[in-house]
Amino acid sequence: MSFKVNWNSLETEPLTNWTKELLTSALNSGKSPNILALNITIKDLNFGKIAPDFEILEIGELDRDRFRGIFKIDYQGDFHLTLHTKVQANPLNIYYHNSLEKEVCNYSQDEFITPNFLLSNEQFAIPLDLKLSDIKINGIGIIVFSKSKGLTLVFRNDPLDSIKVSSTFDTVQVLANFLQKQIENQIRDLFRETLPTLIHQLSLKYLSLDNNINEIKSKLSQQDSVSMTNNELASSLKLFDDEENEFPLIYSSKNLQKNMQLFKSRETFRLSAPKFKNIVQRTRLDKFTKSYPNLLNSLYANNADLQHRFVNNINHGHNNNSNTSSTGIPIELLVSHDDKQHYGKTDNLLKDISSIQANNFYKYSNKDAPNKPKRRRIKVHKKSKVKQDDNTVKASELQNVDSTFMESRSISPQETIDTTSTLIESAPMTRNVSTNIKSPTLETMSTGSSSSASSQVIAHPTPKRAHQPADSTVSTTTINKENHIDYIKARNLYQDFIQMSQSPGYYDKVISNGRGIGLGNSGGNYFGFNGNGNGLERTMSASPIKHLNKDKKSINYIDTSKINEKLNQFRLDGGKNSANTNNSSGGKNFRPGFTRNESNGQQGILFEAFNFPSVAPPPPPYC
């Protein structure tokens, strides 16, 4: 859709004068820069002979009182505008005023001491004529019009294509280029911000007010004899005639008339004030609250037998001159002593109350919703359950014991074990260790009943023997003692046979010499890091025969066949050697119960105090 505008109709003197006044007020609004020595005036304004092309691209909304659409404007005409002003040519004066604004800010010049230079304060104004012509505009804008909110114009793009700026300083090329750039930027800001705001204010001032001012004046004058005096009417009409009013009137005449009638109807001393439709007045608020549906009123309405109580309650409230009536349910309805025939049964009343509350709940909520009204439930003649003690242990909890504890042999409580161990040293020492081992037990506590759970013993696991005795009827105490004794015997035998073995070890070179093992001992370094050669050096085989190297045993290898031979020898010859040694020693450095064998230049110590079996137990396993 396009329009053809009669552009020649704009060349009228009233429109030209109105446009000049509008542009002058817009250009001089706000604070003027310090470079201007005089206000800006419109010297010449000419719309030209070429009309712009105005095209409506889209109409979004169209009604009697509102319009919204998208348009396109294209102008390449002969419009020109000439502005006249005076600029300040004294740079010292401009710098002086700019520095005052920057340093003093909001302080008055009387409170701030400034130097008074004569030359810098002198005015040197030069007249300036600025002509704008050859304007080319091409843009797309949105127009929104409402009868109550006015006209709004917004451009989607930058509509200014080009403009020609000519002034009295065209001979100075630097000033001409500066003015060209500055004016182009200002005109772009004009189309983007200033022009939409200006058009909106003008539409509110001249469209809405001009269309309704005559109608408002006529209707207000007709009500002069009824609701207003002549002075009040004159003052109100003067208010509408005042063009300098800061608050533009944007209400319609019908709304103003209704509001005026409502306001004037309350300016009276009459007791019977006129009612308003669909309005609750403060003077009639008590009647509204009494007639408002609540739980008590609904309960009275559903039960015909309770209506006389409802009437008595209202009369009692009027007699007491109470402004607020209680909407709660009287306790007499639920517990009554004078009229037991009607009010003795509370079940029916409670069901009615529940149904009323449920209907009120589902009235303002979705019936299909899963949420149900929450009710307070009171159970009568219900005893509270006895709380169980937190320390109570249930029998079922005892079944969660680890199976490894159940399979291991238990140690009887308060069992005393005396052990005597001997270190392999030149001066043997005796150590007596007496330990009391008590088996932990779980004491069952009462759970409120007379029967008590059977006690179960949980014992710490002990190392198992290599072979179990055939007789299973041996008592637990005897088995535990034998296991413990056999373990000590096997441990000592293992240490003894390692010492007597042919494999090279640190017993011969370190322990026999009284030297310790470790990096910090002065007697020697086991790893052979010292330079004197006293430490043990780990020898490596240099034989070229590969298969012999493969069959060569490590230094930590233990020959079990030799160990068995030694065991048999000790078993067969132990008594004889012990007797001979006992006679030769004289009882000084020999302890009874030990056997010494000094064959092959090695000393061996064997426990004979314990009657161990004929077959020696194997070494204890490493964990």
From Swiss-Prot:
One of its GO terms (molecular function) is lipid binding. It is a multi-pass membrane protein. GO terms for cellular component: ERMES complex. Component of the ER-mitochondria encounter structure (ERMES) or MDM complex, composed of MMM1, MDM10, MDM12 and MDM34. Lacks alpha-helical transmembrane segments, suggesting that it resides in the membrane via beta-sheet conformations similar to those predicted for other outer membrane proteins and porin. Belongs to the MDM34 family. HAMAP family: Mdm34. This is Mitochondrial distribution and morphology protein 34. The lineage of its organism: Eukaryota, Fungi, Dikarya, Ascomycota, Saccharomycotina.
